[in-house]
Amino acid sequence: MKNVNIVCTSKPGDGLLHYSYEHCCFLNDLGINTKLIIVKNKKHTDQDYIDAINECYTKFENVIFDDYMPKSDDITLIMGRSMLTLAYLDYNSYTEEQKLTLHSLFGGKLISVYSENHVKEYPIALNHFNFTPEKVVDLCDHEVYVNGVGKQFEKIINFSIYKPVVDDIKVKHLFLGTNRTYYREVERHIKDYPDHGILAYKDKYINEKRNHLFVPVKNLLGIFDTYVYTKPNFDPAPRIIQECKWLGKEVIYLRDKSIKDGGPIYWERPAKCLTEQKDKIENLLRWIEKL
């Protein structure tokens, strides 16, 4: 039986953690033995990631932290190239145990979902972890990355494992401020939305005068009325737009509409569930079978 290890090196509030966990669950449901290996960001604990998953989903399973030794023929899957480049860029912050796990997972067969977070660093990261080109397979959402490489692949949310959303409105407008860049852009607009909540981490750049919702947030999708979309930089797969569509919530598109990325693409795409869209990940399943 093929074993797939999905590697996540992001923060607990990052969308790639959620896509990674959702695909882990779906592949297991299809009979493919899959684990999610989380190599923690130094600012966060196991419990931070556990809470992030438990707040969103009906189950917590097949998740391993930091210490894992794959079999020689296992397949590693990353849901975005940044999961590899972050491991390279943050390498000196990891424990020896984490470094060993990363080298073990990033030394063999790799299925890599194309992204452009760290274009220059990606080939350097591949070399750092001693990947051989013939063992690296690319998948890509070509609507988002028109010049990307790889067979077509679209990241789709697995709504089938979501906890029921309880309607309990606490703020009218939700903003995303989970890093310094996002937060700076939110600050440009927030004065026009007095009844707001900013999804954020407790970090030194936040404005204490604002109303914050610190990650993880219980029943996040049930506590706001409207999402205000302000991300100023490239956004490949904005989950919350799809989540709002799924729930029938309003979204205010408050960013430069000339930005060509996943924002306008996911704005137009209908909300759908991964379990109903197996054809959309056919290339992933095909490569798992072939490698």
Outline where the language-model segments fall.
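N-terminal pre-catalytic "stem/leader" segment of glycosyltransferase-like enzymes
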Residues: 1-94, 118-124, 252-291
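A conserved mid-protein helix/loop that constitutes part of the nucleotide-sugar donor-binding site
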Residues: 18-22, 178-192, 201
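Catalytic core of nucleotide-activated saccharide and alditol-phosphate transferases
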Residues: 76-188, 278
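Glycosyltransferase donor-sugar binding loop
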Residues: 39-42, 174-180, 197-209
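Conserved active-site histidine-acidic residue motif and adjacent donor-binding/catalytic loop
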Residues: 160, 203-221, 236-237
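Hydrophobic anchor at the start of a short beta-strand
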Residues: 4, 33-35, 108-111, 194-198, ...
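Nucleotide-sugar-dependent
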Residues: 229-241, 246, 256, 260-261
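A short alpha->beta transition loop at the rim of the catalytic pocket in nucleotide-sugar-dependent
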Residues: 225, 248
